[in-house]
Amino acid sequence: MKFQVKALAAIAAFAALPALAQEGDPEAGAKAFNQCQTCHVIVDDSGTTIAGRNAKTGPNLYGVVGRTAGTQADFKGYGEGMKEAGAKGLAWDEEHFVQYVQDPTKFLKEYTGDAKAKGKMTFKLKKEADAHNIWAYLQQVAVRP
């Protein structure tokens, strides 16, 4: 009986792995991130540029994974919709990131429940696969230890 319970538990845990796995390809994400570099940069806490140029239009994406929306300390350009989403508990994960980058204003309106909410990010990523790939890339290079 003990063996059966352990075997079933192992099978259940193994079956859940695909749900926990990220959907994107980090290498493809590095290439797709080129679209983001016009406005964003990834600079670590020591000042080392990981990706991007000197873009300051959007926030530094280092540490974005799990960060509360609208709270990058040295970025002052957040719109009210983004600040409201953060105040309502939005923390960046793959699901929300993918939705946001495909249509920022639509996402903020839905997340905040405010029909007047607007995203300052006007760029819309056309391919959902690119969004997943960029998220996978950010998980590799932009996570604080």
UniProtKB/Swiss-Prot annotation:
The yes or no answer to whether the keyword Electron transport is present is yes
Post-translation: what modifications? Binds 1 heme c group covalently per subunit.
Listed GO CC annotations: periplasmic space
- Binding-site positions, heme c: 36, 39-40, 121
Q: Give this protein's Gene Ontology molecular function annotations.
A: electron transfer activity; heme binding; metal ion binding
Query: Pyrrolidone carboxylic acid-modified residues are where?
Result: 22
Q: A Gene Ontology biological process annotation?
A: photosynthesis
What InterPro entries does the annotation carry?
Answer: Cyt_c-like_dom, Cyt_c-like_dom_sf, Cyt_c_1A/1B
Is-annotated flag, keyword Hydrolase? no
**Which positions make up the signal peptide?**
1-21
The cellular location(s) given in this protein's UniProt record come to: Periplasm
Q: Which UniProt keywords apply?
A: Electron transport, Heme, Iron, Metal-binding, Periplasm, Photosynthesis, Pyrrolidone carboxylic acid, Signal, Transport
What is the role of this chain? Answer: Cytochrome c2 is found mainly in purple, non-sulfur, photosynthetic bacteria where it functions as the electron donor to the oxidized bacteriochlorophyll in the photophosphorylation pathway. However, it may also have a role in the respiratory chain and is found in some non-photosynthetic bacteria.
The UniProt family comment states: Belongs to the cytochrome c family.
Q: What is this protein called?
A: Cytochrome c2
Organism listed in the record: Cereibacter sphaeroides (strain ATCC 17023 / DSM 158 / JCM 6121 / CCUG 31486 / LMG 2827 / NBRC 12203 / NCIMB 8253 / ATH 2.4.1.)
